[in-house]
Amino acid sequence: MRKDPSVHHFQNKMIGLFLGDTDFSEIVLKKIKKQKIKYFIIDFSKKNKFKRDNHSFRISIGKFGTIIDLIKQKKCKKVLFAGKIAKPNFSSLRLDFKGIYYMPSVISAAKIGDAAIIKSIIKILNNEGIKVISSIFFNPELSLKKGNYSKLKPNKQDISSINKGKIYFNKTKSLDHIQALVVKGDKILAKEGKEGTRKMLSKLKKNSDGILIKLPKKKQDLRIDLPTIGLQTFVDIKKYGLRGVVLLSKKNIFLDKTECIKFANKNKIFINII
């Protein structure tokens, strides 16, 4: 069996994991454990879901000094972010000296959105000589390559809708919240807000006959913020009568792949990676 290049890269090295909520963080951790890579966790989940792991640390986002000291103490040069890291309650945060120094930049980023908070943390880590790698570095199998993965393929009108979506994403700013659109022909039926894809889909009329397009924005930081779909997305696609889903090749996180493809084929939904 061919050895995974990520294992070779991290032989006798330590990876730092900033883990938040959603199944994705657990999938990343499971793979790292399976490959016997040395790791430690900084648990940013709401309910401290990694507390049973002996290598897990619960540190407030305001204690940058403690976080950076831990990373350096572990002789760690590289970290990754996985899962949803929610905006903290800044008024109740306890800060250390580095927290006081760096917190203004995090607070101003928080006004823009969750992705901006992580971007500001990456900047801080960078200042301290710590490199952030892609969230799917150890899980390349979660990202699909170009191709059609369902029995149903996009028709001419669908291709026109896809092109409309591509033009829109090329114009959006890197910190806008929009990572998903529903398009039908030349018309954009829905745009994703801060609340995410599910909330956007819930505002659609039944049998809307559009296409869900999830593409990264221009200048988006693909180490931390890849468009993600899973089985729940397909359940919602069926519920609102959408024709299919479109993602960008190798710039996506596709969870529950086998179940999703099975569900898509059963319900005549296309999966197109462009």
Predicted regions and their residues:
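General beta-strand structural signal in soluble alpha/beta enzymes
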Residues: 17-19, 40-42, 79-82, 132-137, ...
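Catalytic domains of riboflavin
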Residues: 18, 47, 121-124, 128-130, ...
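Conserved mixed alpha/beta catalytic, RNA-binding, or beta-rich assembly cores of soluble enzyme
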Residues: 22-24, 32, 111-115, 127-238, ...
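Feature captures the catalytic cores and cofactor-binding loops of soluble hydro-lyases/lyases
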Residues: 27, 44-69, 73-76, 96-102, ...
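N-terminal glycine-rich phosphate/adenylate-binding segment common to multiple enzyme folds
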Residues: 67-137
